[in-house]
Swiss-Prot record:
The modification N-acetylalanine is found at residue 2. Residues 275-288 have a biased composition (Basic and acidic residues). GO terms for cellular component: nucleus. It comes from the Eukaryota. This is Transcriptional regulator protein Pur-beta. Transcriptional regulator which can act as an activator or a repressor. The lineage of its organism: Eukaryota, Metazoa, Chordata, Craniata, Vertebrata. Residues 23-246 are annotated as: DNA-binding. Pfam families: PurA. It comes from Danio rerio. Belongs to the PUR DNA-binding protein family. GO terms for biological process: positive regulation of transcription by RNA polymerase II; regulation of transcription by RNA polymerase II. InterPro entries: PUR-bd_fam. The keyword Acetylation applies. It is found in: Nucleus. The gene is purb.
Length: 297
């Protein structure tokens, strides 16, 4: 980053030869700075032998830093989650003093409960997203934990059987959610298309240079998103069900699309036949009822 205040690994201890080698092997492709309230946020697109990724750093007023690392595919999911949080935040009315007091954890004004929560698990990383509120206002807390060995989630604290690294947390003021999401989306659009994790690298995705565009459908209060992607295992379809209160998704490998399509078509035809039989029975009952009324006359 040009101004030296990036979320990248600069300005710390030298770390010796290994640190120098990591710096040489990792290339910074782009950087974006956001100033939100009294905080600075840096979004750095980087690339190494494993592919492209985004490092997000929060720099507080005192110069303290917190960092998150997202693969490009996880960053794309984060972008979508941020859209959900933006929508939820927009629906919230102004807080009353009583609501703020209830959502605070005590005399220190710390947040006690979340207004909305989501979590994401990808490979050895877990991400927790919580929209919270305290005396200073509403904010999105994003926490990342990393599995460093066996026993992920057991034992904790890096003790025997516990392989969880101390988590990193950033707190994004709610007023900056849209600006942050848009900046992240721009970096993904500009640098995510050639990421090996998204394209699957040479030979993956069957060698296709392009994939079908994503789409969505609205059914009652639910929206279903269909997104085609690829990784080192091949092409897949991610189907996400999104409601105001939750989000769920499944991933279907390309080789199973035909089977899924056949199953959907079969069930659609069977339900159509069931509905027609049900409708015919209703007509028959109505005709019988009308016939009985005529006989009574």
């Amino acid at each position: 980053m040009a101004d030296g205040d990036s979320g990248s690994e600069r300005g710390g201890s030298s770390g010796g030869l290994q640190h120098f080698q990591r710096e040489q092997e990792t290339q910074e492709l782009a950087s974006k700075r956001l100033d939100i309230q009294n905080k600075r946020f840096y979004l750095d697109v980087k690339q190494n032998a494993k592919g492209r990724f985004i490092k997000i750093a929060e720099v507080g007023a005192g110069g303290s830093k917190s960092r998150l690392t997202l693969s490009m595919s996880v960053a794309a999911e984060f972008r979508d989650y941020l859209g959900d949080f933006i929508e939820h935040y927009a629906q919230l009315g102004p807080s009353s003093p009583e609501q703020i007091a209830q959502s605070s954890g005590g005399d220190d004004g710390g947040p006690r409960r979340a207004l909305k929560s989501e979590f994401l698990v990808r490979e050895n990383r877990k991400y927790y997203l919580d929209l919270k509120e305290n005396q200073r206002g509403r904010f999105l807390r994003i926490r990342q934990t990393v599995n460093r060995g066996p026993g992920f989630g057991v034992g904790g604290g890096g003790g025997p059987g516990g392989g969880v690294q101390a988590g990193q947390t950033i707190a994004l003021p709610a007023q900056g959610l849209i600006e942050f999401r848009d900046a992240l989306a721009k970096l993904i659009d500009d640098y995510g298309g050639e990421d090996e994790e998204l394209s699957g690298g040479p030979g993956a995705a069957g060698g296709y240079g392009e994939l079908p565009e994503g789409t969505s459908i609205m059914v009652d209060s639910k929206r279903f998103f269909f997104d085609v992607g690829s990784n080192k295992y091949g092409v897949f379809l991610r189907v996400s069900e999104v409601k105001p209160s939750y989000r769920n998704s499944i991933t279907i490998p390309f080789k199973a699309w035909g089977k899924f399509g056949g199953a959907f078509s079969r069930y659609a035809e069977e339900m159509k036949e069931i509905q027609e039989r049900h409708r015919d029975k209703m007509y028959e009952r109505r005709e019988e009822s009308e016939g009985e009324d005529v006989d009574d006359d």
